């Protein structure tokens, strides 16, 4: 298995900007891969993606220096093993709320003796000599549970102490929903920012990395300065819609009298 460039980047003390693929299109993935992202995540939870479209996106991105991640739809070992066999270099897993759930996630991502992942990297192991992938996969694949509920915050220390995770990823929408707020990104409430500060402090203490989903480049930059080491900006469909709306509005701003 080739080295995980995102893992190497983190070890060098650098942050990473992450793209997000909701559109089930190899061409969309290819276009995104040319845009300078350090990593790109295929979203199987809320994106319009399935396993076949995920593999097609991976194939389209293969020529570009982006680390390929997947957000799985749930903490289920069959799904997790399948996306890793398909070539994912990391798993972002939603709704990890307890130590036991986190341990199950790690086990599903790691080959024995560190875990229970079944051997069969049908695509991931297709490059290199037989057995080479299995020798390095445990050291290269990133395991990233999502922190997005009040229960996860209550169990944060226990989750972060689970051996084998590489960091955590904040889902601000579900987290704020769990805290009784309207779900949205780029929160400014002091109580939410205090939660982020705690996450950064506790991950740093353990040599782990914190990631967060953002809506805007400005907020993402703030999060990097505050200590997050993986920031996602919206997703491909959101970026497309934003650019399209701005283009249409820009035309009418120039010639509004013709409308």
State where each predicted segment sits:
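Expand to "…catalyze enediolate/carbanion chemistry for C-C bond making/breaking, isomerization
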Residues: 1-259
């Amino acid at each position: 298995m080739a080295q995980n460039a995102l893992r190497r980047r983190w070890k060098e003390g650098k942050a990473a900007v992450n793209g997000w693929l909701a559109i089930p299109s190899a061409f969309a993935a290819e276009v995104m891969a040319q845009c300078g992202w350090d990593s790109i995540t295929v979203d199987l939870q809320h994106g319009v993606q399935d396993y076949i479209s995920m593999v097609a996106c991976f194939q389209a991105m293969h020529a570009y220096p982006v680390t390929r991640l997947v957000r799985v739809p749930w903490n289920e070992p069959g799904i997790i093993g399948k996306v890793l066999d398909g070539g994912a270099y990391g798993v972002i897993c939603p709704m990890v709320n307890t130590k036991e759930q986190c341990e199950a996630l790690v086990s599903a991502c790691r080959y024995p003796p560190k875990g229970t992942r079944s051997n069969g990297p049908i695509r991931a192991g297709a490059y290199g000599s037989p057995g080479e992938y299995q020798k390095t996969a445990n050291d290269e694949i990133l395991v990233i549970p999502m922190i997005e509920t009040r229960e996860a915050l209550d169990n944060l220390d226990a989750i972060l102490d689970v051996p084998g995770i590489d960091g955590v990823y904040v889902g601000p929408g579900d987290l704020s929903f769990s805290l009784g707020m309207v779900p949205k990104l780029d929160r400014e409430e002091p109580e939410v920012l205090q939660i982020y500060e705690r996450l950064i402090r506790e991950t740093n203490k353990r040599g782990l990395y914190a990631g967060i989903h953002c809506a805007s480049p400005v907020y993402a930059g703030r999060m990097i300065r505050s200590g997050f080491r993986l920031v996602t900006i919206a997703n491909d469909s959101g970026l497309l819609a934003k650019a399209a709306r701005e283009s249409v509005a820009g035309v009418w701003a120039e010639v509004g009298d013709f409308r």
